[in-house]
Amino acid sequence: QDQVIKFTTEGATSQSYKQFIEALRQRLTGGLIHDIPVLPDPTTVEERNRYITVELSNSERESIEVGIDVTNAYVVAYRAGSQSYFLRDAPASASTYLFPGTQRYSLRFDGSYGDLERWAHQTREEISLGLQALTHAISFLRSGASNDEEKARTLIVIIQMASEAARYRCISNRVGVSIRTGTAFQPDPAMLSLENNWDNLSGGVQQSVQDAFPNNVILSSINRQPVVVDSLSHPTVAVLALMLFVCNPPNANQSPLLIRSIVEESKICSSRYEPTVRIGGRDGMCVDVYDDGYHNGNRIIAWKCKDRLEENQLWTLKSDLTIRSNGKCLTTEGYAPGNYVMIYDCTSAVAEATYWEIWDNGTIINPKSALVLSAESSSMGGTLTVQTNEYLMRQGWRTGNNTSPFVTSISGYSDLCMQAQGSNVWLADCDNNKKEQQWALYTDGSIRSVQNTNNCLTSKDHKQGSPIVLMACSNGWASQRWLFKNDGSIYSLYDDMVMDVKGSDPSLKQIILWPYTGKPNQIWLTLF
């Protein structure tokens, strides 16, 4: 047992809470998959190392310890003085290794929200979170009082403010805001949908094939609109701080991202899964077989995504690295920049011309030529070609049947929101009803003001300190393609730099391009 992770509500600040959550995340991280931290693979964890304790106190006098299972980041038990209490569904080994020397009791409910809410006679929406709620939870559990209803309610507070906050950047951020402003809050529909879909999102990322999830994950926006997440490059994936371990991607042993060796019995994701999806790209248009013509050599174009899923915009991502519509292959005519991309019979085409890798960053590359799929024309119906990879916006793609832009506000330094002002962009107090703070995130990696989706966030130059402004999307430049990363940065692939609030001073009214430092003025969050 290394040092106990501690948090006290006495004199707590958003900073002290942030440090607590970061320490907890660090202790729970077992590796990286697709560059996202993941809990340890249960097959690699010995039972005696399966649990960690977190000490929560609200003063010198009152503290409790919470036992957390490292394989799912879940609260399984707590200790109050010389007594310890275990949730009904706690693993058998929990009572062996957690809180030795205490008198152990079993609680009458398990750790699922359904059961906790039934015993609490309240739903999560009705239970306030924040410092006051946590202070009370610690006092109540420490008192050893036998009121089951109140026990369940206080555990709902602790689970969300510790476990859920460790799993999601947006939940830890929300708690941080409530500490900073001294106000309690109830979980909104977006937060609840994230809590309910943690295993689905984790599985989607780990089982993704060529960027596509095996199943859609349906989240909710704050105003109860469905948010469909069906691809690794969907910007919402960046709110994950920690994933549940589901399985290792089949090619993980070649992946430099995995920091632990694969053991024999470790679960490998199925490689049999071959998703059929749309491929959205420039200006949200879809990869389309021109005029439904499947004769060899017919060109592939960018066309507006149809209201219904239709065959000539549907592509099966095969495990042999071909991408097929109606059984025929997406094929490059040659290996020189500017060669056009066509539909072709898979068996008679040159094999290397039909192979494509879809990278996590939205690049679709033909390995033989090292050229990438590109929509050079901004007009509908333009022929797709292969070009030298420059991470241009017109070379950005996202797979999935839901190719419509994802509309969100973007909060950053000091919990202020990104706001469009003419051709400029800066930070202002967040206001859900302000159109100037709504951003449409397109499949091509562009970030567009909802007020005018012909305008894209663009870095003026390719150099450190360059201001970020709104410019015409019709350019399709590299300076208009952005990646939302799990470290909180909004990243320019071409420049290898990130969006940065100049000088950590919002009053300068400038967001600039700057090398990544990880400081708070480079950390952003989609609030959908």
UniProtKB/Swiss-Prot annotation:
Keyword Ribosomal protein: no
Xref: InterPro entries: Ribosome-inact_prot_sf, Ribosome_inactivat_1/2, Ribosome_inactivat_prot, Ribosome_inactivat_prot_CS, Ribosome_inactivat_prot_sub1, Ribosome_inactivat_prot_sub2, Ricin_B-like_lectins, Ricin_B_lectin
Residues recorded with modification Pyrrolidone carboxylic acid: 1
Residue positions of the active site: 164
Homology family: In the N-terminal section; belongs to the ribosome-inactivating protein family. Type 2 RIP subfamily.
2-beta repeats: 453-492
1-beta repeats: 326-366
2-gamma repeats: 495-528
CDD domains noted in UniProt: beta-trefoil_Ricin_abrin-like_rpt1, beta-trefoil_Ricin_abrin-like_rpt2
Annotated keywords: Disulfide bond, Glycoprotein, Hydrolase, Lectin, Plant defense, Protein synthesis inhibitor, Pyrrolidone carboxylic acid, Repeat, Toxin
SUBUNIT field: Disulfide-linked dimer of A and B chains.
1-alpha repeat residues: 283-325
Protein name: Abrin-d
Gene Ontology biological process terms from the UniProt entry: defense response; negative regulation of translation
Record's catalysed reaction(s): Endohydrolysis of the N-glycosidic bond at one specific adenosine on the 28S rRNA
Residues of the Ricin B-type lectin domain: 273-400, 403-527
Each 2-alpha repeat, start to end: 414-449
Domain notes: The B chain is composed of two domains, each domain consists of 3 homologous subdomains (alpha, beta, gamma).
Pfam families cross-referenced by the UniProt entry: Ricin_B_lectin, RIP
Protein's organism: Abrus precatorius (Indian licorice)
Residues bearing glycans: 200, 361, 401
EC numbers for this chain: 3.2.2.22
